[in-house]
Amino acid sequence: MDMMKKRKLDENGNGLNTNGGGTIGPTRLSPQDARKIIERFTTDQLLDLLQEAIVRHPDVLESVRLTADSDISQRKLFIRGLAADTTTEGLRSLFSSYGDLEEAIVILDKVTGKSKGYGFVTFMHVDGALLALKEPSKKIDGRVTVTQLAASGNQGTGSQIADISMRKIYVANVPFDMPADRLLNHFMAYGDVEEGPLGFDKVTGKSRGFALFVYKTAEGAQAALADPVKVIDGKHLNCKLAVDGKKGGKPGMPQAQDGGSGHGHVHGEGMGMVRPAGPYGAAGGISAYGGYSGGPPAHHMNSTHSSMGVGSAGYGGHYGGYGGPGGTGVYGGLGGGYGGPGTGSGQYRMPPSSMPGGGGYPESGHYGLSSSAGYPGQHHQAVGTSPVPRVPHGGMYPNGPPNY
């Protein structure tokens, strides 16, 4: 090339900052220049570009985290269906495989020191929670548990309610000494289990004589019911759709009390009477399987101990349990739960102003059976009696309905 022509090209800015292929390198572009290039892109086009950049470039992922992690509701998970002997350390060990944890806790019974059947996990980054939710059903200590966003609460649609009713089965005559994992291994042969077995005593960890399983598909439940009588270790177990229990009209669901607790309270997944106030109390009452009434609570988030920090519709009725007369479901109930105004202690208690009164949980729900349902071979509560002491209105649960 003539030297005079080359000098003129250089003076006009050509031939500078090339990447070897004759094109101008990106270092000459300012952020404003880049914005002008993409500002006419559609949302889908921008998402396509950004998702590839997040996966390929760690610095882009960190930038996205700075914005996404500010919403704790997308990082906090609720895990239900835990065994009585599941510990915080075990929960942390499992979920830390998905990402760095800010907090993990199994909620314990203050009397027995054992798991109440649920816990919370908060990830440091939203992508850790996202990975953990890819498979919501996780086998932990012989149980298939369910993981969900804590903020999602009880927000099932009508179609979801109908769908669950066709996937949930009730198993009667379960031997008291049959381990949960033995029962689970048998029923997993019919299809993928979403949750179960439910119904084991929270204190002893033993069967109460029945169990519940929720399959991921209705076909799995139907396969399990093709032969309604199962023989496991020489014992005959009777199976049916759990929803059928609402049609029988037989009085008296089983009302088994805590084995050896000596407190007269009914604990555990299946039996769902009012539970004693505990250290995780909230003004609206967190019913037996936890739950948030109303909108997000206005409590402080100053510490990492914020497992109860995201409010929503609650874990109440959607998985309501076997509420007998005056009883509340195990996954929720009328104002039942861990304390009302002035009750509870410890770092997880919410201020009374953070939640509306009145509880807000139906007596039973998609995982529950009506108080009129009856199954053979179970312990029945005598009509007109209750293992739970009645408290005058305005007593233990001043915001709840009468007799709570």
From Swiss-Prot:
Annotated tissue distribution: Expressed in root apical and lateral meristems, young leaves and embryos.
Entries under InterPro entries matching the protein = Nucleotide-bd_a/b_plait_sf, RBD_domain_sf, RNA-binding_reg, RRM2_NsCP33-like, RRM_dom
Q: Name one GO biological process term.
A: cell death
Per UniProt, subcellular location reads as: Nucleus
**Any idea which UniProt keywords this protein has?**
Nucleus, Repeat, RNA-binding
Q: Where is this region: Disordered?
A: 1-29, 246-270, 344-404
Q: Which Gene3D superfamilies match?
A: 3.30.70.330
Q: Which molecular-function annotations from GO does this UniProt entry contain?
A: mRNA binding
GO CC terms of this entry: nucleolus; nucleus
Q: Supply the induction statement.
A: By wounding.
Give the main location.
nucleus
Pfam families xrefs? RRM_1
**Where on the tree of life does the source sit, at the highest rank?**
Eukaryota
- Where in the numbering of this chain does the RRM domain appear? 75-152, 167-248
Q: Which PANTHER family match?
A: GEO13361P1-RELATED, UBP1-ASSOCIATED PROTEIN 2C
Which miscellaneous remark does the UniProt record hold?
Answer: Plants over-expressing UB2A1 display severe growth defects consisting of premature cell death and chlorosis.
What is the recorded function of this protein according to its Swiss-Prot or TrEMBL entry? Heterogeneous nuclear ribonucleoprotein (hnRNP)-like protein that acts as a component of a complex regulating the turnover of mRNAs in the nucleus. Binds with high affinity to RNA molecules that contain U-rich sequences in 3'-UTRs. May function in complex with UBP1 and contribute to the stabilization of mRNAs in the nucleus.
What is the name of the protein in this document? Answer: UBP1-associated protein 2C
Q: Which organism is it from?
A: Arabidopsis thaliana
Q: Which gene encodes it?
A: UBA2C
